[in-house]
Regions:
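Conserved beta-strand elements of beta-rich interaction domains across eukaryotes
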Residues: 11, 25-27, 44-46, 85-87, ...
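Catalytic palm subdomain of template-directed nucleic-acid polymerases
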Residues: 25, 88-103, 121-125, 155-189, ...
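Short helix/loop capping segments that flank catalytic or ligand/cofactor-binding pockets
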Residues: 29-31, 48-50, 89-92, 99, ...
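Catalytic palm active-site di-aspartate
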Residues: 81-88, 115-123, 147-171, 196-206, ...
Length: 498
């Protein structure tokens, strides 16, 4: 592939070391797919402005993937997946980037180094260079980059998403996907023969006999249970206690029974892709990743025991008939740590934002996060902050749904968008629905920041409403606090479909 040429080493060269990287690639169920060995450059030895400049490279949002999977179920689309072999070796180094690498062990020639022509694995600029290469090739075969997601590509008959070198295709006719994949190969892209989309980035896409789709990560859950040593342990039926998880600085030290950071990393990936029901519990445990205590070990193991009891389940995509039906459920827990954490700890007075946005009654985006940007001074203020955060995600999502529905050619009965924001706080409802805003001395200082939100409500008033919801029906509640078993299972059923 002309990745390099051997040149004589000179004194002015910044020669970076090389290394071998060995990786096990797994199927979504955890079984080994193949062993990989890559000759890599030591990117940590590069010097910015000398042998690399820009490094940013986007990847597809999982919100986009879930939206496409909902459309697949609704419209009976065909889907295929492909993988670009030796992806980074497709793209050239940009002009002015002179990168020199040691020759690999066993092939060294005294006084000589490798002058790279292609973006070798390990270089800081490699992901960006390949992304730019892929965009160019996609455009050349009629797949145009979306303005709402830089890794979503829309054509006349095919839609594709890309996460580095992993690509998912959708079309009404499977033949169109094969033709588009062939066109990419003819452009020099080494795209492996596409297969049925049974999994993507470690998430199993299981299509049931009744036409429903379930996103699950049983293989990852098994690895978490094994890492925690819970194979023979009893199970739990909720992922978190009813009381918040505190810092416990003076408590018993962490007993080092497992790698806390590693397990938290796996749990975060799981919570962000197929298990929103554990998002609150995982976010709380992740706060103490760098200074865990014994109490945090027990909290993480509780999550593991809950996952053990529900390991075979994930998000069930059971879409309603209208993909343009969007529901947002923002919620907040005002100063939820107060009285549980030490009063001298600034985080004890922080509130928590939690929300989920459903498209066609299926969850596509969710958040459980501490309100670190500011400290709410009342329940209404905490709710407004949560509503504001939710709307920052909702409005672009509405535009993306409109774009995708146009691209796939929705039938006429499905072309009317209806968006509803479900709010359970009366004060937040009044502030959200009032324009021009009726400021009070207590609300002015933070309400000004949200005027854009109310202006958007006015612009979209024909399709968007903000309405009252009973607290017991508020889906956002599952993202803000630990709930009793009955309440948790009721909301989980509404959220996850089981």
């Amino acid at each position: 592939m002309g990745a390099w040429e051997v040149v004589k080493k000179t004194a002015e060269m910044n020669v970076i070391r090389s290394t071998w990287a060995f990786k096990i690639k797994r199927y979504p169920d955890g079984l080994i797919k193949k062993f990989k060995a890559r000759f890599c450059a030591r990117g940590d030895m590069q010097i910015e402005g000398v042998d690399f400049f820009e490094t940013y490279a986007p990847v597809v949002q999982w919100t986009t993937v879930r939206l496409m999977l909902i459309l697949e179920v609704l419209l009976d689309l065909k889907s295929k997946q492909g993988d670009v072999t030796a992806a980074f070796l497709h793209s050239d180094l940009e002009e002015g980037e002179n990168v020199y690498v040691e020759m690999p062990t066993g092939f060294r020639k005294e006084g000589h180094v490798l002058s790279l022509k292609k973006t070798l694995y390990g270089l800081r600029q490699s992901p960006r260079a390949f992304w730019k290469y892929l965009v160019k090739k996609m455009e050349s075969v009629g797949l145009h980059q979306s303005e709402f997601d830089p890794c979503l590509f829309i054509g006349e008959t095919v839609i594709a998403v890309a996460f580095v070198d992993d690509i998912l295709f959708w079309s009404v006719d499977e033949k169109d996907i094969h033709e588009k994949a062939l066109a990419l190969r003819n452009q020099g892209v080494l795209l492996e023969e596409e297969e049925d989309a049974a999994g993507f980035l470690g998430v199993d896409i299981q299509k049931n006999e009744d036409g429903l789709t379930e996103l699950k990560q049983e293989g990852l859950i098994n690895r978490i249970v094994e890492a925690l040593g819970l194979q023979d342990s009893a199970v739990k039926y909720t992922p978190a206690e009813g009381t918040p998880l505190v810092r416990d600085t003076d408590g018993e030290p962490f007993p080092q029974t497992f790698n806390y950071a590693s397990v938290i990393g796996m749990l975060l990936y799981l919570a962000g892709h197929s298990r929103p029901d554990i998002a609150y519990a995982v976010n709380m445990a992740a706060r103490y990743m760098f200074s865990p205590r014994s109490i945090h070990e027990k909290a993480v193991k509780r999550i593991g025991r809950y996952l053990k009891a529900t390991r075979s389940r994930g998000i069930v995509l059971r879409p309603s008939e209208n993909v343009l039906k969007i529901d947002a459920y923002p919620d907040a827990d005002f100063a939820g740590m107060w009285g549980h954490e030490e009063n001298t700890d600034p985080s004890s007075v922080k509130s928590r934002t939690g929300f989920v946005i459903n498209v066609a009654d299926c969850p596509v985006l969710w958040v459980s996060k501490l309100q670190n940007g500011c400290t709410a001074q009342s329940t209404m203020e905490a709710e407004i902050i949560a509503l504001n955060h939710c709307c920052r995600e909702l409005f672009p999502l509405m535009d993306m749904v409109t774009s995708l529905s146009t691209a796939v050619g929705l039938p006429q009965p499905m072309t009317t968008m209806r968006v509803c924001v479900h709010e359970d706080n009366a004060g937040a409802l009044v502030l959200a629905n009032t324009l021009p805003p009726q400021y009070t001395p207590r609300s002015k200082f933070y309400a000004i920041k949200t005027i854009w939100m109310r202006e958007e409500f006015v612009k979209r008033k024909d399709i968007l409403t903000v309405m009252k919801i009973d607290t017991v029906e508020q889906l956002g509640d599952i993202f803000t606090k630990g709930l009793p078993k009955a309440t948790f299972e009721y909301l989980r059923n509404k959220l996850m479909g089981w």
